[in-house]
UniProtKB/Swiss-Prot annotation:
Residues 22-54 form the LisH domain. It is found in: Cytoplasm; Nucleus. It holds the Pfam family CTLH. GO terms for biological process: proteasome-mediated ubiquitin-dependent protein catabolic process; Wnt signaling pathway. Core component of the CTLH E3 ubiquitin-protein ligase complex that mediates ubiquitination and subsequent proteasomal degradation of target proteins. Acts as a positive regulator of Wnt signaling pathway by promoting beta-catenin (CTNNB1) nuclear accumulation. It comes from the Eukaryota. Residues 60-117 form the CTLH domain. PANTHER family: RAN BINDING PROTEIN 9-RELATED (PTHR12864). Belongs to the GID8 family. One of its GO terms (cellular component) is cytoplasm. The keyword Cytoplasm applies. InterPro entries: CRA_dom, CTLH/CRA, CTLH_C, LisH, Ubq-SigPath_Reg. This is Glucose-induced degradation protein 8 homolog.
Amino acid sequence: MSFAEEVNREEWMEKIGKLRFQRAEMNRLIMDYLVTEGYKEAAEKFRIESGTQPTAPLDSLDDRIKIREAVQKGDLEQAVSMTNKLNPDILDSNQQLYFHLQQQRLIELIREKDIEAAVEFAQGQFSEQGQESGRYLEELEQTMALLAFDNPEESPFGDLLHTSQRQKVASELNAAILEAEHKKTQPKLANVLKLLLWAQDELEGKKVKFPKMAEIASGTFEESR
């Protein structure tokens, strides 16, 4: 295909429709994602439905699952405690992760409208970290800015109160636990998606007009421009 060629949506979708993927390979990608991210119940259900064997014993996920669930429920104190019991070096050797866990704990106090406790926690926790917290000053300022709004969810930094923020921190902690256990920290599916984004950037850089995937989660495409 020459770089000047324009591919319309119908032609592009027809080409995609002709691609053939083995069901077993797709199932392995899904199972790898569920195991790596610590979704034991979903992995067990998928094993039964698809016959795909997990990439690791599912019982080995229990500690990671409990820690992830604690973060996703907003119980950061419990998540930190369980992580330290599992392996104290995980947080001792990862200042960025520790900051994000404490930041999330602050966010949960703000979510609960416990302003006095939030200010007290921020003054105590982040002043103790001293120079280290200075590295993350912008993130801390954005979090503290939530206190200035009657409805912080509707503020410019309201995304910090979304459940996706908990998910982000849970995934960061999950990856750190995997790394400490000398296991791969990212599911293969994430690498496939990165490759997709890279390929789209390459095509755009070569001025090829094509229907770009605009929303990966839903698989929706833009019209060619």
